[in-house]
A protein has these predicted regions:
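N-terminal small/glycine-rich loop or linker at the start of catalytic domains
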Residues: 66-72, 141-165, 284-298, 360-362
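Alpha-helix-loop-beta-strand connector modules within alpha/beta enzyme cores
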Residues: 73, 133-139, 153-155, 159, ...
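Long, compositionally biased, glycine/small-hydrophobic-enriched stretches that function as flexible linkers
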Residues: 1-141
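Glycine-rich, proline-tolerant flexible connector loops at the mouths of alpha/beta enzymes
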Residues: 112-118, 122-130, 189-206, 327-340, ...
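Internal helix-turn-beta structural module
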Residues: 382-383, 390-395, 399-444
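Intrinsic low-complexity, glycine/proline- and repeat-rich
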Residues: 442-456
Length: 456
């Protein structure tokens, strides 16, 4: 394993595989904050050159957090398909990149190979790809998952309807939900971040969203994004009724601990929701991630934030989720500084999620102190649509009045669908057409008019 190279008369040498991964990463303010980023463009190029010549085996044998010390590492390593791994372990990262991008390599071939790749290897492949590579490769991979409906079928761009409310008010949540439905959002999930993380609040919102779904016979799934332990306690109660179990996850055991979560807890939640939940299909978990969360809890172990993010996906695939999405700008400019970094992180995350075999979505968002704006979000949303992202977020005017950040709007989702000739999930599309919200591949005559729910 060679960890040095010569470039323009200068020798660049790296301490270990973790250092190569970090120095090969595209510029991120979080990596600079952590002191692991490349010190120059030439050093970054040199690291990419070294990384490209490492093998799949080199990456597996050198996880960024030791196997003996970390439950996330153990899950990633133990889930590897040894037969597939034996076939590709001698391939270099550069060879894997070229093979994935080859026109003769289809989704089925990539998905089989992915079972032999650790999260570090997947991160490595992404680090030597340009943005166009990430878009092209991401769009080649087709992954489906089923809760009440199936996400990931051909030419579908789904949307999470996010009807958040500052006090979890039933009337406000209902109004926002009906408006979002009238614009065609909500086929991925109707999912609310509660302002109050209690069992009673979770039960109340489950009932509110469930009543709307049942009253109007909407083919979708609902979710309340309270802590996993809150959801489990709520589901065990007599009033408990849910489709999906949500939890934010991270790429190390220590970072999970900062969220109040363990891998055993996630296994318990998956089993409970399969037993007592109302999902018709086998995929009952919903995970959110985001570059920088491990660093923010001092649990990155000297690794770069994109490699740690990839490890989130290695953890996620263990639980066969229905939905996974990166909340790409939510951590703020301390981790993702500006639009350039936001674009790169979004494309990296969707590609790495897909190469893990996940139905990958993205919350294209930013905090109010980032040097970016809605025009940038709309551009990124369009890029992700071409990259095959499974779903994005639909919020009223792209403004979350509870979490106080900016995302993408109901109108944005409809526009990208029309532009790229994408459709909602088929059963949901049929439901929209019945109500006049969707016609001939775009918004219909009743779009944006939730009053029709009270006149039929």
């Amino acid at each position: 394993m060679i960890l040095k190279t010569s470039m323009l008369g200068q020798i660049y040498e790296f301490k270990d595989v973790k250092d190569v991964l970090a120095k090969a990463s595209e510029k991120k303010s979080g990596d600079e904050l952590a002191g692991v980023a490349a010190e120059s463009k030439l050093q970054r190029i040199a690291a990419k050159e070294v990384l490209g010549q490492l093998t799949v085996e080199d990456l597996r044998e050198n996880p960024v957090v030791p196997y003996e010390e970390d439950s996330v590492t153990r899950i990633i390593q133990d889930d590897i398909d040894e037969e597939v791994y034996s076939e590709i372990k001698g391939k270099t990262i550069q060879e894997m990149r070229e093979w994935i991008l080859d026109d003769t390599t289809d989704s089925d071939k990539i998905m089989r190979a992915s079972k032999g790749l650790t999260s570090e290897a997947i991160a490595a492949i992404s680090k030597i790809m340009g943005n166009m590579d990430l878009i092209l490769a991401g769009s080649k991979m087709h992954i489906t998952a089923t809760c009440n409906t199936t996400i990931g079928t051909e030419n579908v761009l789904a949307a999470r309807l996010q009807p958040n409310h500052p006090i979890d008010g039933v009337e406000g949540v209902t109004a926002s939900t009906l408006e979002g439905l009238s614009y065609g959002s909500g086929d991925a999930v109707i999912g609310l971040n509660p302002a109050i993380d209690t069992v009673d609040s979770t039960l109340a919102i489950w009932k509110t969203l469930g009543d709307i779904r049942d009253k109007y016979q909407i083919p979708t799934q609902t979710c309340v994004l309270s802590h996993v332990t809150t959801q489990m306690e709520a589901l065990r109660s007599e009033q408990g009724s849910a489709d999906l179990c949500f939890q934010s996850i991270a790429g190390s055991e220590a970072a999970l601990s900062a969220f109040g979560v363990t891998t055993e807890m996630l296994e318990e939640a998956e089993a409970l929701f399969k037993e007592k939940g109302h999902a018709k299909g086998p995929n009952v978990m919903y995970f959110e991630t985001g570059q920088g969360s491990e660093l923010s809890s001092s649990a990155a172990f000297g690794a770069d934030q994109q490699t740690m993010e990839s490890r989130c996906y290695g953890l996620a695939r263990h639980y066969h989720p229905f939905l996974v999405n990166t909340v790409v700008g939510f951590m703020g400019p301390e981790y993702i500084y500006d639009t350039k970094q936001l674009i790169r992180a979004a494309l990296e995350d969707v590609f790495c999620g897909h190469l893990h075999g996940l139905p990958m979505g993205c919350d294209v968002c930013y905090t109010n102190h980032m040097p970016t704006d809605q025009n940038d979000s709309e551009a990124i949303l369009t890029l992700l649509g071409t990259a095959g992202v499974h779903y994005v977020m639909g919020l009223p005017q792209a403004d979350d009045i509870m979490l106080m950040y900016q995302s993408t709007s109901y109108h944005d989702v409809a526009s990208v669908r029309q532009l790229l000739k994408k459709q909602p999930i088929p059963e949901f599309k049929e439901w929209l057409e019945k109500w006049g919200f969707w016609e001939n591949g775009h918004l219909g005559r009743n779009a944006g008019d939730p009053s029709v729910f009270f006149t039929k």
